[in-house]
């Protein structure tokens, strides 16, 4: 959520900055004026409420004086009762006006950083850099075929039990998946990240502070039972985001770096018909996530953003998977992101780059809703500063596994990346269990 003061010119704000950001996103510009109007209405109601409270205090003092002097205060007492009724109604108006304002404010995306390519077409994503030598042979097997040839997942039984996109990892598939998780956690620990295994579900009110409204329909599974409804997490970012809810964090403690590990659950309602085979796009997967908090001052969060994408790059370099890093166009940014990089790894069988990593700087957009503040607790609302929050995939392991299979395949099986071998009991190669059909 944006700072409401950005919309208040009399408070030093500049609504034109918000309008320009909305233009870059291909989103409504008119909403800025709607918010300004709603804000003025809310503040007017607040002013009227304060006047009623002042009147109440004034009348009460007059009643006290009359009682001391023995005068008749009955008419004034009647006025206080009328004032109480008016105040109660005005409080309801204030709350209604505030709800209308913030409901609208929450639909405006974060301010798009000036370095983001402006377009609504993802074909215009800017390639920042590439790494590695791509395999270009013909007749390579794709990850769906390789999973079957190796016997490392049972998709048929998975679909029978869990429905479409269901799967069982099996044998070396389990070991390879766990190897990626353990390698990822070791990798981040060496870079001063604190590991966190997150809850797999969240309360609705907390999830609402971490996820966009559209995600509730397209991504999130609802869990019902005793007590409040809960939602399964779609990414470790969501519970990591809420970890410091309502906290004051001293600047000397920043930056904070977390390595989140979790299973994730997605309905994938918006991707119907895409990648229905294999384990690339599934409803349940494991993830190791980078999540960082920085001071809001200077370029701290932007330097951290570059550090985080470099971490992800180094991870895939150690796996020896060719990739490109792209800067995502303004029209494809989610609401929270001011800027986002994707790391897309090379899948040689389909001869295309596919996204394995998303790395976003969300500045103070999420921390405002979550009240994650920087500094010492202050009574002055205007003096509050909010931490900047950043997130980046390190590995969504089933996707990374698919990429490894395609890049490390041979005629007889699949080689295991050298950095994963210590986590595989020293195993270096997976043999095909089925013969390749010529």
From Swiss-Prot:
It catalyses: tRNA(Ser) + L-serine + ATP = L-seryl-tRNA(Ser) + AMP + diphosphate + H(+); tRNA(Sec) + L-serine + ATP = L-seryl-tRNA(Sec) + AMP + diphosphate + H(+). Its EC number is 6.1.1.11. L-serine binds at residues 235-237, 289, 393. SUPFAM superfamilies: Class II aaRS and biotin synthetases (SSF55681), tRNA-binding arm (SSF46589). ATP binds at residues 266-268, 282, 355-358. Pathway: Aminoacyl-tRNA biosynthesis; selenocysteinyl-tRNA(Sec) biosynthesis; L-seryl-tRNA(Sec) from L-serine and tRNA(Sec): step 1/1. It comes from the Eukaryota. Keywords: Aminoacyl-tRNA synthetase, ATP-binding, Ligase, Nucleotide-binding, Protein biosynthesis. GO terms for molecular function: ATP binding; serine-tRNA ligase activity. It is an enzyme of class 6 (ligase). GO terms for biological process: seryl-tRNA aminoacylation. InterPro entries: aa-tRNA-synt_IIb, aa-tRNA-synth_II, aa-tRNA-synth_II/BPL/LPL, Ser-tRNA-ligase_type_1, Ser-tRNA-synth_1_N, SerRS_1_N_sf, SerRS_core, tRNA-bd_arm. Consists of two distinct domains, a catalytic core and a N-terminal extension that is involved in tRNA binding. Belongs to the class-II aminoacyl-tRNA synthetase family. Type-1 seryl-tRNA synthetase subfamily. Homodimer. The tRNA molecule binds across the dimer. This is Serine--tRNA ligase. It comes from Helianthus annuus (Common sunflower).
